[in-house]
Amino acid sequence: AEASKDRIRVELLNYKRLLPGTKILCNIQAIHPLALVVSMCDQMLGHIPVTSVSEKLTERLQNALDQDDEDDEEEDEEDEDEEDGPPELPDIFSVGQWVRASVESVTSIGSKRQWGMGREGGEYERESQRVQLTMEPRIVNEGIRADDLSEGYLLSATVQSREDYGYSLDLGVSDDVHGFIPTKEILRVGAVLLVQV
């Protein structure tokens, strides 16, 4: 009788138990122009809008919109360098890539799912809309202190800027803690990476 008291019952994760603020590891299933469709455990789907990827990406998108408004007035100017424009989601992510996310909202199902049907067409998209997630490192890494960071620690980071021998990263931990990744590989400013200290 006493052994049963020491046991902890682990519940399967489902849409009803998924609460805002829950941190979850996701796998990218589809990449759309304005959102990522991700798979979570227990065959649940969610979506990450382009504005919930990182603050830096959102800032670059807003600047591009503002620039487009100005360019409409001045058509004769030369095209900007491709690197100056915001990256598109397929440039940053790939299907099958693992990402960390935090639940922003969960909506109840609008219509009953018809059993026997696969996740084809609109149903797949509709089901992914039930859970809205964010990848912003300041939200996903919430609760992590600078003291917690030690060798081997895994966390999300945003590519802030290109440096001479790599890229500076915003870890979203605190204003005075930043990262650096030495690489010759080309990364896009605003991209979110899963990095290890």
Locations of regions flagged by a protein language model:
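Single-stranded RNA-binding regions, centering on S1/OB-family and related RNA-binding modules
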Residues: 1-197
